[in-house]
Regions:
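Intrinsic-disorder/low-complexity loop/linker signature
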Residues: 224-225, 603, 695, 751, ...
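Extended, non-catalytic subsegments within catalytic or DNA/protein-binding/adaptor domains
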Residues: 1-590, 602, 759
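Extracellular/secretory pathway and lumenal proteins
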Residues: 566-568, 658-661, 705, 767
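Intrinsically disordered, low-complexity serine/threonine-rich regulatory regions of eukaryotic proteins
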Residues: 6-7, 502, 508, 515, ...
Length: 789
């Protein structure tokens, strides 16, 4: 052991290394803790609120070191807080957080508020503020926190079934669906927080999360002697920024036996890895499946060098730089929206699944293992914040000496998340009509009508504000309706009521997407990943990761049916013509192929949009239509033209024509390719139907299928039914763009407007039209048949 250096020698060595030249940052300034950007924003907001309070009370010159003014300030804060979920009452915890943010923010900029003063204000919030609120207003300070909710396996499966088996939302990239499910499964299986594999909102723009260089992937021979894939993930856990060596590690794997494929985390993760060509020594799925590891060892699969610094869960949004890590903000919004679509009024959160995961880890493992799994340092954190109030014990069974049961408590824990499988995704037509009569809503529409076409900055800003207010009103009414919506399961297991419009979309369009069509079935089968069913699902997920759009072409309108030369084939270049709900674009020009094939066919030919077959000859077309009419199950329930993925998925049909036996079959099944002519046609037939109805009888739904045999007391209720169940938006008023086109045509005939000006006017109003897209606007008169006549 070398001799210990003297003090002079010790510092001499430091001076030789440049100690005396390093003077920057050596001063008498107080060094403060470096919080996250999110925390700093919270501090700054509270200091600015104090400045506003002081400005409002400038006549008394309030001081933050005066207890009287601090109490008054925090009282004003409590009155100003908006409660959660339509509850106007502030929560004690929220007021306390605001107070702590204020004291922390003030301490960073000025002399700290004395500890006795801060403690007194804290006690004021707990003991005196509730009485002041109750005495001086109708508010009360809510002391209890929201009850802990638990994302049980059933809720996990409900989300999975919606995402893969019935989802009508089209993401910007098909890979988003795979990445989201992979991230969700990783979070669920490791009881992670939302920002530990992807970029947390508290660490915005930090790029922190899970990267390939921190991931270990291998193949081993399992207990049954079979090769099995496994992956180890490292969580960037909360509170471990300065102790990265302590971060929890979690392993996920294929599994030993049969399981529903939707529950296999290796399925979406392996799809991502294969699509990304992440492995250094293996480039295809077949090569990976052929690996035979040695007994008792894990064969490490190395990553490519150029992928080590890439995130495992990357963003697929065009709004972020390609390859950047996904953000908790974006992922959380999509998960929340998925929850609404699944039927939850209050959708499950990542933390709900974390709570359920920790519940099971606590039951099956030691306290030390649970703490490491959770990324917690205090053993009481679980008991205080995650342990269910229903401890899972069976007092009845244990007392009477019966077999103890756990299923009852598990199911009750699942009830902490309420779900309605038929939760409406939009207001019913009757509710929309009631909303239109609301004075606040009507005032917004009147002002929007006045601002239509005005392009000055002030009008544009005001219009955006009004549209936001309008959306807020609609959302508020929708939430009210959802809370009162009946939730009664049918004893037969079938839905007694017609499904809402949105829940029928996927079944109408799934034939356009072979991969999603197959996954909607295979993922819910019980199999292993290496079975034929599992490999089919894996290959379909890989295809989604590699695809630019979910819809490549429409069956019946394949690209080869275009008769043009290759150089003259029209392709869409950008999102500009027929668009989906996300303004996505398919390069497949279905309309050109449809017209081109018809034009170049000898004689009459028509595409049946119900069965995707071309029928040649008028007689054969008539008989084909007759065959559909004799088979009511083949007739569409929703009869509006539906564009999905940039192509026409289903043509529009008239419910009145379909039921009119006096017409020829081809007239009864007339196909509308555009919404405008379809709306005009159905509206005119509806008016004729009303005039011909017998005023003494109930009005029947004209749909010829066996799906619906409803009858109604009034024409208004029939119209509501048609809008909800069969002909969405057929009475919708003209859009802003349609109104402007009519005005331009009139001005053109009068010679008042030039073509270039018309183009400018059209471009100007397209923004208005975009804002009001999909916002149903109805004009109803609820009248009886006798009144209508």
């Amino acid at each position: 052991m070398p001799p210990r250096k003297s003090a002079d020698e010790f510092f001499r060595r430091g001076r030789e290394k440049g100690s005396e030249q390093c003077k920057e940052g050596i001063n008498d300034s107080v060094v403060l803790k470096q919080p996250t950007d999110k925390s700093l924003r919270g501090y700054g907001r509270m200091v600015s609120l104090w400045n506003q309070y002081a400005k409002h009370h400038a006549e008394v010159n309030p001081s933050p070191y005066d207890l009287k003014y601090l109490k008054d300030f925090i009282k004003d804060i409590a009155f100003s807080i908006d409660g959660a979920e339509d509850d106007p009452n502030p929560a004690e915890g929220t007021v306390m957080v605001y107070w702590k943010q204020f004291t922390a923010g003030w301490r960073r900029e000025y002399d700290p508020i004395p500890r006795n003063t801060t403690l007194s204000v804290r006690n004021f919030i707990i003991y005196e503020l509730p009485e002041i609120l109750t005495r001086e207003s109708s508010l009360k300070l809510v002391k209890n926190k929201r009850p802990r909710r638990f994302g049980t396996k059933n809720h996990f499966l409900h989300l999975g079934r919606q995402l893969w088996g019935n989802d009508w939302v089209e993401y910007e990239k098909p890979a988003t669906r795979v990445y989201d499910w992979a991230a969700h499964m990783a979070i669920v299986c490791s009881a992670a927080r939302i920002g530990e594999y992807i970029e947390s909102t508290s660490r915005s723009n930090s790029g922190r999360g899970l990267y390939y260089k921190e991931v270990t992937f291998g193949v081993f021979r399992n207990e049954h002697g079979n090769a099995e894939f496994a992956i180890q993930l490292v969580r960037d856990a909360k509170g471990m920024t300065h102790t990265p060596d302590k971060r929890p590690e979690h392993s996920l794997y294929e599994g030993l036996g049969l399981m529903p494929l939707i529950c296999n985390p290796m399925l979406p993760i392996l799809a991502i890895l294969v699509a990304a060509k992440a492995f250094k020594d293996y480039s295809t799925l077949a090569e990976l499946l052929a690996i035979e590891p040695a007994d008792g060892e894990m064969l490490l699969l190395r990553w490519k060098d150029d992928i080590l610094d890439q995130p495992l869960f990357k963003s697929t949004s065009s709004k972020r730089t390609t390859g950047k890590i996904e953000t908790a903000n974006a992922f959380g919004r999509r998960l929340r929206a998925l929850g609404f679509r699944t039927g939850y009024i209050r959708p499950p959160t990542v933390h709900d699944f974390r709570a359920e995961g920790l519940y099971w880890i606590d039951k099956l493992y030691s306290v030390a293992q649970r703490m490491k799994h959770a990324g917690q340092r205090d053993p009481n954190t679980f008991n205080n914040h995650y342990q269910p109030n229903n401890s899972g014990t069976d007092g009845q069974g244990s007392y009477f000496g019966h077999d103890v049961r756990s299923v009852v408590n598990d199911l009750f824990r699942g009830l902490t998340l309420e779900r309605n499988p038929q939760l409406s995704q939009s207001l019913p037509a009757e509710k929309q009509e009631a909303l239109r009569t609301d004075p606040e809503f009507a005032a917004i529409e009147e002002e929007l009508a006045v601002l239509l076409g005005q392009r000055d900055p002030a009008s544009t800003a005001r219009r955006k504000t009004l549209y936001a207010q309008k959306r807020s009103l609609v959302d508020r009414e929708l939430r009210k309706w959802q809370k009162t919506q009946p939730n009664r399961p049918n004893p037969t297991g079938e839905d007694s009521a017609m499904p809402c419009y949105h829940r029928s979309i996927f079944n109408r369009v799934r034939f356009l997407m072979p991969e999603r069509d197959r996954l909607a079935s295979t993922l819910f089968e019980t199999a292993t990943l290496r079975s034929s069913t599992g490999l089919s699902a894996l290959k379909d997920m890989i295809s989604l990761c590699e695809a630019d759009a979910e819809v490549e072409y429409r069956p019946g309108l394949e690209p080869q049916k275009c008769q043009c030369d290759e150089s003259h084939r029209r392709r869409r270049k950008s999102p500009g013509a027929i668009q989906s709900s996300l303004n996505q674009q398919s390069t497949h020009d279905w309309r050109h192929i449809y017209n081109c094939f018809k034009k170049n066919s000898s004689g009459f030919t028509e595409l049946c949009f119900l069965c995707n077959d071309w029928i040649s000859g008028e007689f054969k077309w008539r008989e084909h239509c007759r065959l559909h009419l004799t088979r009511p199950k083949t007739l569409p329930v929703q009869c509006d033209p539906l564009v999905y993925g940039g192509v026409l998925a289903t043509a529009g049909y008239c419910v009145f024509c379909m039921s009119d036996t006096s017409l020829e079959p081809e007239a009864r099944l007339r196909q509308f390719l555009d919404r405008g002519p379809w709306k005009a046609h159905v509206q005119s037939h509806f008016e004729s139907y009303v005039q011909s109805a017998d005023g003494g009888e109930r009005v029947k739904c004209p749909h010829p299928g066996k799906h619906c045999s409803a009858s109604f007391d009034s024409v208004g209720h029939l119209k509501f039914h048609l809008l909800d169940a069969h002909c969405r938006d057929f009475t919708k008023e003209p859009s802003a763009l349609e109104v402007l086109k009519q005005e331009d045509e009139m001005l053109k005939q009068e010679g008042i407007i030039e073509p270039t000006l018309r183009k400018k006017r059209k471009c100007g109003v397209e923004e208005d039209a975009k804002d009001v897209k999909d916002k149903s606007v109805y004009r109803f008169i609820d009248e009886t048949v006798r009144m209508a006549r």
